[in-house]
Amino acid sequence: MNDVAIVKEGWLHKRGEYIKTWRPRYFLLKNDGTFIGYKERPQDVEQRESPLNNFSVAQCQLMKTERPRPNTFIIRCLQWTTVIERTFHVETPEEREEWTTAIQTVADGLKRQEEETMDFRSGSPSDNSGAEEMEVALAKPKHRVTMNEFEYLKLLGKGTFGKVILVKEKATGRYYAMKILKKEVIVAKDEVAHTLTENRVLQNSRHPFLTALKYSFQTHDRLCFVMEYANGGELFFHLSRERVFSEDRARFYGAEIVSALDYLHSEKNVVYRDLKLENLMLDKDGHIKITDFGLCKEGIKDGATMKTFCGTPEYLAPEVLEDNDYGRAVDWWGLGVVMYEMMCGRLPFYNQDHEKLFELILMEEIRFPRTLGPEAKSLLSGLLKKDPTQRLGGGSEDAKEIMQHRFFANIVWQDVYEKKLSPPFKPQVTSETDTRYFDEEFTAQMITITPPDQDDSMECVDSERRPHFPQFSYSASGTA
């Protein structure tokens, strides 16, 4: 779509994701799916270039509700493999109808456009430009992946939206982590709408420190992501046992994380957003693997809708708490928090009371143990700046600014990417099914996958429900 135009604009009340107050925002909806909000109505081009909120309504799901306020509507979609929601309200039912109709019209137009692109691409499967969006049917015409093709070995994690299981592919003997999400949580049963799956980001990402996606497929009641399995355990697990890492060990892990985030930002134009120790795994050799296993730990029922407090609040950046637009700099805040934990043995800000915790994140100055070296203090101070524009990595140079910091002075970044640096710790795993570095709370549990009403194959997907997840299925070419 070459000509981007404003479809609708006006004032909306947006509810904060974390501090649940309502804030007036002036929103612009564009025909490319962009849905951007400002504190004041933008008067010129310069003001339009710095929105507080920046969302996409592409193939979103819309829900109307009268709670927690009358004339509320909710936009729900998948961001990577995590469900996100944004809540708005207006003064009258007519206003709500105007907004939801406009949003649905834009989403439908984008869906048609994508289908036309898909039709064009599917005619030339050898064209790699469209490979990330091809169905399994295109990659392997005679075969569709089903749940029956895996042995289910051990539970690796569990949450509100589903579970992560260690599986073995029967045909190849290869081990993977399968993330299984329940459709009923993602798609309201009484809504005929489309849910965006940004799993194409995972499909098309190739980086040594990012978890690769091997397959994604759906059954009539589940979405399944089959991902590379790193059995060196969570960094959280290792840090919990050792309490603190040396600066050299933290530097090694930090460099691999920076390399991966640089790739996502510069090559994929993606903000990871959810950097925390639990999402950092080690592979069998001790290298970092950033995962997307994110399962919401707790679900909070809020009125008529399921409002989920996803993620660990200790990692939230100030701009996220203030409900401002967050760009790439949010990932550098996350890097600051995890590196602080590694080198200091505790979180930079902590309080069991969430409101007090948020106040600390927004207001409290960072403190360091006396044992920390000057370069480490300088790095962490830069990464944990409250103002994202002043943060290390917050400028146009992004990751390059962090790479040039004196804490990383001895790091050769190409060597990092090529895994030429020796890991400071090598996991003592004896086999691919060795889960000693995973929480026994999960691995000791029996695996239960509730039997569906009919065979769990792609063919059984009810044609009425299948369109909820268009172009969801995927198979990586070659080996993951």
Curated annotation (Swiss-Prot):
<dbReference type="GO" id="GO:0019899">
    <property type="term" value="F:enzyme binding"/>
</dbReference>
<dbReference type="GO" id="GO:0032436">
    <property type="term" value="P:positive regulation of proteasomal ubiquitin-dependent protein catabolic process"/>
</dbReference>
<dbReference type="GO" id="GO:0009725">
    <property type="term" value="P:response to hormone"/>
</dbReference>
<dbReference type="GO" id="GO:0035556">
    <property type="term" value="P:intracellular signal transduction"/>
</dbReference>
<dbReference type="GO" id="GO:2000402">
    <property type="term" value="P:negative regulation of lymphocyte migration"/>
</dbReference>
<dbReference type="GO" id="GO:0072656">
    <property type="term" value="P:maintenance of protein location in mitochondrion"/>
</dbReference>
<keyword id="KW-0007">Acetylation</keyword>
<dbReference type="GO" id="GO:1990418">
    <property type="term" value="P:response to insulin-like growth factor stimulus"/>
</dbReference>
<dbReference type="GO" id="GO:0010595">
    <property type="term" value="P:positive regulation of endothelial cell migration"/>
</dbReference>
<dbReference type="GO" id="GO:1903898">
    <property type="term" value="P:negative regulation of PERK-mediated unfolded protein response"/>
</dbReference>
<feature type="binding site">
    <location>
        <position position="86"/>
    </location>
    <ligand>
        <name>1D-myo-inositol 1,3,4,5-tetrakisphosphate</name>
    </ligand>
</feature>
<dbReference type="GO" id="GO:0016310">
    <property type="term" value="P:phosphorylation"/>
</dbReference>
<dbReference type="GO" id="GO:0110099">
    <property type="term" value="P:negative regulation of calcium import into the mitochondrion"/>
</dbReference>
<dbReference type="GO" id="GO:0010748">
    <property type="term" value="P:negative regulation of long-chain fatty acid import across plasma membrane"/>
</dbReference>
<dbReference type="InterPro" id="IPR000961">
    <property type="entry name" value="AGC-kinase_C"/>
</dbReference>
<dbReference type="GO" id="GO:0032794">
    <property type="term" value="F:GTPase activating protein binding"/>
</dbReference>
<dbReference type="GO" id="GO:0031663">
    <property type="term" value="P:lipopolysaccharide-mediated signaling pathway"/>
</dbReference>
<dbReference type="GO" id="GO:0006412">
    <property type="term" value="P:translation"/>
</dbReference>
<feature type="glycosylation site" description="O-linked (GlcNAc) threonine">
    <location>
        <position position="312"/>
    </location>
</feature>
<feature type="site" description="Cleavage; by caspase-3">
    <location>
        <position position="462"/>
    </location>
</feature>
<dbReference type="GO" id="GO:0022605">
    <property type="term" value="P:mammalian oogenesis stage"/>
</dbReference>
<dbReference type="InterPro" id="IPR008271">
    <property type="entry name" value="Ser/Thr_kinase_AS"/>
</dbReference>
<dbReference type="GO" id="GO:0010975">
    <property type="term" value="P:regulation of neuron projection development"/>
</dbReference>
<dbReference type="GO" id="GO:0010628">
    <property type="term" value="P:positive regulation of gene expression"/>
</dbReference>
<feature type="active site" description="Proton acceptor">
    <location>
        <position position="274"/>
    </location>
</feature>
<feature type="domain" description="AGC-kinase C-terminal">
    <location>
        <begin position="409"/>
        <end position="480"/>
    </location>
</feature>
<dbReference type="GO" id="GO:0099175">
    <property type="term" value="P:regulation of postsynapse organization"/>
</dbReference>
<dbReference type="GO" id="GO:0051721">
    <property type="term" value="F:protein phosphatase 2A binding"/>
</dbReference>
<dbReference type="GO" id="GO:0009408">
    <property type="term" value="P:response to heat"/>
</dbReference>
<dbReference type="GO" id="GO:0006417">
    <property type="term" value="P:regulation of translation"/>
</dbReference>
<dbReference type="GO" id="GO:0046326">
    <property type="term" value="P:positive regulation of D-glucose import"/>
</dbReference>
<dbReference type="GO" id="GO:0071364">
    <property type="term" value="P:cellular response to epidermal growth factor stimulus"/>
</dbReference>
<dbReference type="GO" id="GO:0046329">
    <property type="term" value="P:negative regulation of JNK cascade"/>
</dbReference>
<dbReference type="GO" id="GO:0043066">
    <property type="term" value="P:negative regulation of apoptotic process"/>
</dbReference>
<dbReference type="InterPro" id="IPR011993">
    <property type="entry name" value="PH-like_dom_sf"/>
</dbReference>
<dbReference type="GO" id="GO:0043491">
    <property type="term" value="P:phosphatidylinositol 3-kinase/protein kinase B signal transduction"/>
</dbReference>
<dbReference type="GO" id="GO:0032869">
    <property type="term" value="P:cellular response to insulin stimulus"/>
</dbReference>
<dbReference type="GO" id="GO:0045792">
    <property type="term" value="P:negative regulation of cell size"/>
</dbReference>
<dbReference type="GO" id="GO:1902018">
    <property type="term" value="P:negative regulation of cilium assembly"/>
</dbReference>
<dbReference type="GO" id="GO:0018105">
    <property type="term" value="P:peptidyl-serine phosphorylation"/>
</dbReference>
<dbReference type="GO" id="GO:0071889">
    <property type="term" value="F:14-3-3 protein binding"/>
</dbReference>
<dbReference type="GO" id="GO:0010507">
    <property type="term" value="P:negative regulation of autophagy"/>
</dbReference>
